């Protein structure tokens, strides 16, 4: 039989012989995973390696797709088994619910910004370098708890475990209803009449209602009966065990709510179906303006160092302008002396001096007129001083390495920060010690001068460039 097979093989062409041998080797020697079909090509060498790899990849992808479909079908069956409601208001089911998320696998020894679940009994409202506020809220719900009003049974492992605290970034101008939606999306639903619904969230804060309870002192004036009291201390204030609480509307802005709640140490968040309320410490004025004041202090140090260089350059520029003015007076006095000497002490006399002085005076007037056309400003001593001082200042700034653009920017930002802090201080009804954060009276004076304009080198708002008799304010007063 082997002899006959050998004769049949020798009777084939070389190309067919090679393909037949390769097929036989692939069928009997290579495992079944690496089997492939090699098309016979006459008079050509058969290459099947890349085709084998493609078939292997296709087989693996088919297996992965089959496993994925099986897993999806199994998950769908589990979801269908746990499906207890069909209402449109129901939240996502158990596997997709955010309160069932496991804690992150971070290093347990690494420092944490948020305390442990068991140690965090009260929420916190923190300020950020931006205008946003960071609300850290404890979540007293078990990871396997499906409804707020139905706690987990006692046979569950770690019955006292709770979900990790929740962090939310909110803007002071957003309403409380927006914060309510954020909290509702992160807590379990409530079971109500056999259906799931989102639990209602109520925000309550301490209120000044002593007048209604009759505990107000009779010695106080009746004029202040309808005036709310503010302290701005927040969580830094004293504890008031007999505090009066009031419910706030969801349309109230978060910033207004926090500002009013700052009269007490904390505000409360009530969740429907949960027997306890969530307390959150209220930020004080110092907390709300912490990053603003730190930024202002850093800017104040830069302003103080840059103002020294700027004052030196400005002083030298003004001294140079005054010396130039004095030099002009000396030139006029010298010209007067030359005319006097030539007229009365030489043989040239007035016949020669008269046309010379006439032409010199006319040339001076023409030059002054051309200079006025060039600068397009009022022809006055103040305008001439401005041009001279500004050019000298620019040269000195460049020589000393003073950046005028950066100076203007940092002054503008510092004044804006001062304005924002003053607004918050007025809202909290506290007195802000501006000198302490600015680093002294000198920086405050520099900011005020740069804001209002000084030395005639900066234009103030609502005024012309020259505060002379033709200024806009004086013209309005005359009218």
UniProtKB/Swiss-Prot annotation:
- What GO cellular-component annotations does this UniProt entry give? mitochondrial inner membrane; uniplex complex
Residue ranges that the UniProt entry lists as topological domain Mitochondrial intermembrane:
345-354
Transmembrane parts of this sequence: 324-344, 355-375
InterPro entries from the UniProt entry:
MCU_C, MCU_fam
Among the record's GO biological process terms, what is one? calcium import into the mitochondrion
* Start-end of Basic and acidic residues biased regions: 60-75, 94-122, 206-224, 445-462
User: What keywords would UniProt list here?
Assistant: Calcium, Calcium channel, Calcium transport, Coiled coil, Ion channel, Ion transport, Membrane, Metal-binding, Mitochondrion, Mitochondrion inner membrane, Transit peptide, Transmembrane, Transmembrane helix, Transport
**Residues the record lists as binding Ca(2+):** 354
Question: What positions does the record give for the motif labelled Selectivity filter?
Answer: 350-358
Question: Which parts of this chain are annotated as the region Disordered?
Answer: 56-125, 206-238, 445-479
Q: What is this protein called?
A: Calcium uniporter protein, mitochondrial
Q: Which organism is it from?
A: Gibberella zeae (strain ATCC MYA-4620 / CBS 123657 / FGSC 9075 / NRRL 31084 / PH-1)
Q: Which gene encodes it?
A: MCU
